[in-house]
């Protein structure tokens, strides 16, 4: 027979060098009739079958012994639907010829992909089930503009790159091939021939599923349906709502006790979600679950951005996990990593032989801290790949938000680099303008396509406008992690209480920038790894002090303006650092192993969450200055802080923190509203394994000036504790009489100096007028239980502080000079 295919062309196919298979294979018009050509390595016989009549049309001639067939049908002068009946040894199969199908990609999609402005590129690129000419199969598409040849390889073609070379669309750089009869779950990759004639075997960047490491193939999976966000979930993400986030690493929250292996998505959902609900958290934040090759990266070095990791099951299993969380009223946030990717050969690195996804120059494209590659945000197709991925997770799995990892490393070209190791931007500056534009664009897309979605930035610098809308010059995030607050407060809490008075500003400085952004207060996984110790072990002192410090810190954090985030295990004060290879130490909650200390902290966190949600003053005005006021900010000597939180109606809630192991009795401070105040939470309570020192009953304000207020209350502040007071009932006050204001010290604390006669009169008065800074501090600092009896109020105030006789476990202090006083106090008791 006569064919118009040269031997050089045939050799190019078998050598894997031919770049345009559709120009040769399939059905073609010739002067002599319709010709069909087929590349079927190792086939013995090929017959053309008319699909409509099921008649044999002709047998193709084997032009090349390796398996190239061709045949001309003079009786046919127009295209028709056909199948190929192929004999391989003793096996005869009827197959669809992939090269008889027309291009599937729409002109608009092709144009948008070329422009890098496709809203949902994942709907076009990757592997998608579809039907063409009544034939079902999978359409494969890959962006690889600099490759000489791209083939699909997989279970269905013996991983032979000669069998399914793809069609190239020059305008967009996209390769395409529809392969009939490919099944759900089939494994596949793309084989690329680069410009240096090197073969590269790559996973699909847009794959919806992937193999479990160490295997690296992509897996045919179904694209989930779009999920609409409900009004309730949208409301739960708002600035004026209580947001308490439980950060979770799915691989180590809890494991199979028999073999220490991971639980699957369904098993995790059945245990984790009821626990989170019971603990009172409103959101779950998952460490990255996009497929990643190295367990030790915790997911922060992903390769398959569109594939939920197969460590815990299928994409459908992850979808069920999210659905179960929503059914329980819990929103789900995903840690998302668009800042860098690993250099594994099956991934994005030098994808088509060129720096396609990354920068070619290591000064721009190599991350020195993590030995990873940095995305080229200036390339539209790369920006499209990443923005589309954020949208994919939100709308296809119904996620309620994303937390963007390592934003600072993205927006600064000199991040973690010395002089000479980075390239300035076009204006000579250090900002990565392309990355900034990418973040603005992504946040804008998410906000417009799915209003109410929460976008959170882990940004560790003072970059301005992180949570401003893009139209106002900001990055467009809804929240930013307050890394400054976290570092300052943990630095303060690590100190021995005797030294905290010299570092008082570490807890007050945050208010200077509190309202510059919308903040989340993060106690994340980063603070309990790499030798940093657990939160519990960061605390100074003996066992009692460590737990008391941590409880006081949590109480302070939950009352401070900003949404809350706590990494798993910290809710029960796990004693060791987090280990991603093991389950959390749940046994510590057992009374025998944990002595009640850990269960006490767990109970406190549960109560903090419930109090937080119940008291709108603690969250409603987080981002507004009118929601917060320092009542005592300058008592560095006693390491006491007092502030007031308010809701939109102006209703107050007062928070008192004592960061020394010394109880403060008769501690007086001014209040804004006259009335009765009730202690509603005390981190030193018995049920939390505290000493039990409290302010039993209701405390009435008195017309005694303190801290610039005409009304004040006098309380007992437990050692190493935070106490919340709620206004139970307001009281009208007669027209204020003139009150002589006392002098203050240079640092703002109220002066203690009085003349001798005035001091004596104060001591014998039935109505106590002693201010916090005037009260004699209790010097006791022993491990023994010391009975603290508060001074009883006069009979005209029967409801206030009826008694304070609870035993308080008062711990030792580092002050050597306090030992003598402590002994005397113990003896007197």
From Swiss-Prot:
Q: Which SMART domains match?
A: Aamy
Where are the compositionally biased (Low complexity) regions?
778-789, 810-820
CDD domains xref list: AmyAc_Glg_BE, E_set_GBE_prok_N
Q: Which reactions does this protein catalyse?
A: Transfers a segment of a (1->4)-alpha-D-glucan chain to a primary hydroxy group in a similar glucan chain
Top EC group: transferase
Q: Which one Pfam family would you cite for this protein?
A: CBM_48
Presence of keyword Transferase: yes
Its GO CC terms are:
cytosol
Active site annotated at which positions? Answer: 405, 458
One of the GO BP terms on file: glycogen biosynthetic process
Q: Which SUPFAM superfamilies match?
A: (Trans)glycosidases, E set domains, Glycosyl hydrolase domain
Q: Which UniProt keywords apply?
A: Carbohydrate metabolism, Glycogen biosynthesis, Glycogen metabolism, Glycosyltransferase, Transferase
> Could you tell me which residues belong to the region Disordered?
758-829
Q: What is its EC number?
A: 2.4.1.18
Its pathway, per UniProt, is:
Glycan biosynthesis; glycogen biosynthesis
Under Gene Ontology molecular function, one entry of this record is: 1,4-alpha-glucan branching enzyme activity
Family in the record: Belongs to the glycosyl hydrolase 13 family. GlgB subfamily.
Q: Fetch the NCBIfam families from UniProt.
A: branching_enzym (TIGR01515), PRK05402.1 (NF003811), PRK12313.1 (NF008967)
Q: Which HAMAP family match?
A: GlgB
Q: How does it assemble?
A: Monomer.
Its annotated function is as follows: Catalyzes the formation of the alpha-1,6-glucosidic linkages in glycogen by scission of a 1,4-alpha-linked oligosaccharide from growing alpha-1,4-glucan chains and the subsequent attachment of the oligosaccharide to the alpha-1,6 position.
- Give the protein name, as stated in the record: 1,4-alpha-glucan branching enzyme GlgB
Origin species, per record, is Actinobacillus succinogenes (strain ATCC 55618 / DSM 22257 / CCUG 43843 / 130Z)
What's the name of its gene? glgB
